[in-house]
């Protein structure tokens, strides 16, 4: 089941990444982030490791929140990776800064910092 789930998540990730490339052509130089399902995430639904181009998603959250994970959490984390690839890190910017918010708007999503999902 996890292998099928991961395949689906990777397909959605690639679709989101391609949509972002249309808005931000510079992203074509970067691969879509690699997705890892992680059983260790119990409070955080997703975590982006920007320099490794990798996103960890809480596997346990999928049991009760599959749609929200695919429609909210995954794009949220992909937006972090796109923000990093396009604009880099800045001590003056937090992870949910203006550029990240703009990317979320391009995805047609609210720029929420936190989730309310339960395991």
Regions found by a protein language model. Give the residues of each.
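Active-site-proximal or metal-binding-adjacent scaffold patches in catalytic folds
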Residues: 1-72, 81-119
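Walker B catalytic acidic pair
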Residues: 77
């Amino acid at each position: 089941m996890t292998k099928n789930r991961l395949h689906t998540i990777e397909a959605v990730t690639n679709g989101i990444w391609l949509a972002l490339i249309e808005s931000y052509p510079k992203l074509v130089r970067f691969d879509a982030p690699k997705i890892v399902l992680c059983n260790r995430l119990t409070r955080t639904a997703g975590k982006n490791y920007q320099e490794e181009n990798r996103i960890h998603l809480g596997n346990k959250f999928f049991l009760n929140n599959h749609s929200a994970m695919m429609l909210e959490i995954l794009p949220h984390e992909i937006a972090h990776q796109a923000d990093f690839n396009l604009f880099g890190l800045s001590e003056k910017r937090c992870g949910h800064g203006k550029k990240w918010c703009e990317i979320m708007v391009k995805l047609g999503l609210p720029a929420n910092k936190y989730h309310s999902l339960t395991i």
